[in-house]
C-alpha cells in the first residue's frame, strides 16, 4: 500500500511550498504535487544572456514582511525600483508629467474629485474585516454593485473616474464593469490602502529581486527536499472519507494523506473531481471567480535612452495597450529594459493579435511617450498569462457581483479533510507574493493544530 502522508499539497507555487516548508519544520511527512515542470506558480523568471527577468510577479513592497524575511533566509538580495525623472500620465487624451509616487496625483494636477474619491474608497475599505469581508453590515449592498456603478454614482470629474477605472484594470486585471465593488474594497483593505497598492516608495512596487522572483519557490523546494515533491503531476480527483484522503493524478499515480491543502486558484480548484461533492456554495464560488487577464511585456534596449531625456520610464495610460510600465533595468544597469502591462479586456483583445502586432503596438506606446528611439529594441519578450493552463490568468481570481457576500466564507472554510490556500485566500496583500506566503502560514497552522492535537 502507498505511503500515508500527513499532508498532500496540490500546487507548487509560493503558497504550497511555504506550507510544505512549515510542515517539514514541524516534523510532518508532506508531499507537494505540482502540475507543471517548474516551481513558482504565477512567478516565472527567464534568463536573457546573464540576467534574470520576471515574466510573472516581481516586486517586493515596503510592507511585505513575509517575503522580506524569506529573502533574508534564502540569501536573495533586493534593489530599489528605479523611478528618477518625469513620469507620464496620459488620461482622457491629455498628457501631463508628474514625479514621485502615483498617490501624489491625488492632490495634484487639478484632477477634480480624485482626492475625495480615493479618500472615500480608503475609508470604506478600512471598515472591512480582511478575514471576513462578507460580514460587514453593508457587504450585501456593496456586492450588488460593480466598481463602474459605484464610480458612476459617487465620483466627480471625468479624469478621476478614468483613473479609478484604470486602477481597477491594472491592479485586478479586470474591467470595472466586471468586478464587485465589495471585492474591490477587500482587495484594497488587504494591502492597507490605495497608496500602498499604487506606489513605489513604501508601496507595492518598492523593490525588485536580483535573480528574479522564481528563485524564492526554487529555494523553498530545496528546503523541503526532492523526496517531498513531484513535478508534472496534475491532480484530477480527491476522494475523502472519515479517516483519510486519496488523490489521483493525470500520470496515473495515487497518493494517500490525512489532510490535503489545495493551493491553486479557486477556478482551477473547481476543475478537480471531488468525492463526496463540494458544498453548493463552495462549488458556486469556483465557477464565479475568474482570473484576471494580463500580458506582461519586457522590452530590452541597448541603452536607457529615456533616462538621458529625464524620464523614469514610468507611465500611466487609459489609452493603452500598455496601461502601466516601469524601468526594468538590472541592478547594475548592464541590462536596460522597460516592463509594461496590457491588462483586463485589452489583454484578451490583444491576445488574439499576432506577436508582431502586439510588439508594434507596445513600441508605438513607448515612442508616443519617449520618442522614436523606443522603436528599436534589442529584444522583446511577452507572457500572456491567460494561455497558462495551470494559471488561466493573472494576477488573481476576482469575484463578480453577488459572489463574495454569498460564497466568500467558503474561500477558506475546510471541507472535511480538504483545506484551501493561495493568494486569493490571504488576509494581507491578496494577489501578491506576500499574500501567497501568508496563506501558506495560515493553512499550515490550521492543519498542524489538528494533527498535533490528535497525537496528544
UniProtKB/Swiss-Prot annotation:
<dbReference type="InterPro" id="IPR001613">
    <property type="entry name" value="Flavin_amine_oxidase"/>
</dbReference>
<dbReference type="InterPro" id="IPR050703">
    <property type="entry name" value="Flavin_MAO"/>
</dbReference>
<comment type="similarity">
    <text>Belongs to the flavin monoamine oxidase family.</text>
</comment>
<keyword id="KW-0560">Oxidoreductase</keyword>
<dbReference type="InterPro" id="IPR002937">
    <property type="entry name" value="Amino_oxidase"/>
</dbReference>
<keyword id="KW-0274">FAD</keyword>
<dbReference type="Pfam" id="PF01593">
    <property type="entry name" value="Amino_oxidase"/>
</dbReference>
<protein>
    <recommendedName>
        <fullName>Probable flavin-containing monoamine oxidase A</fullName>
        <ecNumber>1.4.3.4</ecNumber>
    </recommendedName>
</protein>
<keyword id="KW-0285">Flavoprotein</keyword>
<feature type="modified residue" description="S-8alpha-FAD cysteine">
    <location>
        <position position="394"/>
    </location>
</feature>
<dbReference type="InterPro" id="IPR036188">
    <property type="entry name" value="FAD/NAD-bd_sf"/>
</dbReference>
<dbReference type="GO" id="GO:0097621">
    <property type="term" value="F:monoamine oxidase activity"/>
</dbReference>
Amino acid at each position: 500500500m502507498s505511503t500515508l502522508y500527513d499532508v498532500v499539497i496540490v500546487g507548487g507555487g509560493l503558497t504550497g511550498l511555504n506550507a510544505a516548508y512549515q510542515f517539514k519544520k514541524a516534523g510532518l511527512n508532506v508531499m507537494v504535487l505540482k502540475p507543471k515542470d517548474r516551481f513558482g506558480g504565477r512567478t516565472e523568471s527567464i534568463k536573457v544572456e546573464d540576467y534574470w527577468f520576471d515574466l510573472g510577479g516581481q516586486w517586493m513592497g515596503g510592507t511585505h514582511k513575509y517575503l522580506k524575511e524569506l529573502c533574508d533566509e534564502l540569501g536573495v538580495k533586493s534593489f530599489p525600483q528605479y523611478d528618477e525623472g518625469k513620469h507620464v500620465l496620459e488620461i482622457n487624451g491629455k498628457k501631463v508629467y508628474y514625479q514621485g509616487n502615483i498617490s501624489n496625483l491625488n492632490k495634484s494636477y487639478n484632477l477634480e474629485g480624485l482626492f475625495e474619491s480615493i479618500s472615500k474608497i480608503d475609508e470604506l475599505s478600512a471598515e472591512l474585516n480582511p478575514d471576513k469581508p462578507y460580514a460587514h453590515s453593508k457587504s450585501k449592498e456593496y456586492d450588488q454593485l460593480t466598481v463602474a456603478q459605484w464610480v458612476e454614482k459617487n465620483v466627480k470629474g471625468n479624469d478621476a473616474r478614468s483613473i479609478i477605472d484604470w486602477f481597477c484594470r491594472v491592479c485586478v486585471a479586470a474591467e470595472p464593469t466586471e468586478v464587485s465593488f465589495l471585492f474591490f474594497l477587500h482587495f484594497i483593505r488587504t494591502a492597507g490602502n490605495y497608496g500602498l497598492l499604487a506606489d513605489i516608495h513604501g508601496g507595492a512596487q518598492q523593490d525588485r529581486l536580483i535573480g528574479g522572483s522564481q528563485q524564492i519557490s526554487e529555494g523553498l523546494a530545496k528546503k523541503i527536499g526532492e523526496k517531498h515533491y513531484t513535478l508534472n503531476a496534475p491532480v484530477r480527483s480527491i476522494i475523502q472519507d472519515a479517516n483519510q484522503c486519496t488523490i489521483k493524478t493525470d500520470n496515473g499515480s495515487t497518493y494517500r494523506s490525512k489532510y490535503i491543502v489545495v493551493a491553486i486558484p479557486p477556478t482551477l480548484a473547481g476543475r478537480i473531481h471531488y468525492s463526496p461533492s463540494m458544498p453548493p456554495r463552495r462549488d458556486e464560488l469556483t465557477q464565479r471567480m475568474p482570473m484576471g487577464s494580463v500580458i506582461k511585456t519586457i522590452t530590452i534596449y541597448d541603452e536607457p535612452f529615456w533616462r538621458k531625456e529625464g524620464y523614469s520610464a514610468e507611465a500611466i495610460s487609459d489609452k493603452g495597450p500598455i496601461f502601466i510600465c516601469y524601468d526594468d533595468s538590472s541592478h547594475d544597469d548592464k541590462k536596460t529594459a522597460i516592463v509594461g502591462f496590457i491588462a483586463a479586456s485589452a489583454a484578451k483583445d490583444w491576445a488574439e493579435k499576432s506577436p508582431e502586432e502586439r510588439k508594434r503596438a507596445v513600441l508605438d506606446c513607448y515612442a508616443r511617450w519617449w520618442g522614436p528611439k523606443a522603436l528599436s529594441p534589442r529584444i522583446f519578450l511577452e507572457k500572456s498569462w491567460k494561455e497558462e493552463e495551470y494559471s488561466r490568468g493573472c494576477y488573481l481570481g476576482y469575484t463578480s457581483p453577488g459572489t463574495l457576500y454569498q460564497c466568500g466564507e467558503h474561500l477558506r472554510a475546510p471541507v472535511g479533510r480538504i483545506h484551501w490556500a493561495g493568494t486569493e485566500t490571504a488576509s494581507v496583500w491578496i494577489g501578491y507574493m506576500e499574500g501567497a506566503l501568508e496563506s501558506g502560514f495560515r493553512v499550515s497552522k490550521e492543519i498542524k493544530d489538528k494533527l498535533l492535537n490528535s497525537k496528544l
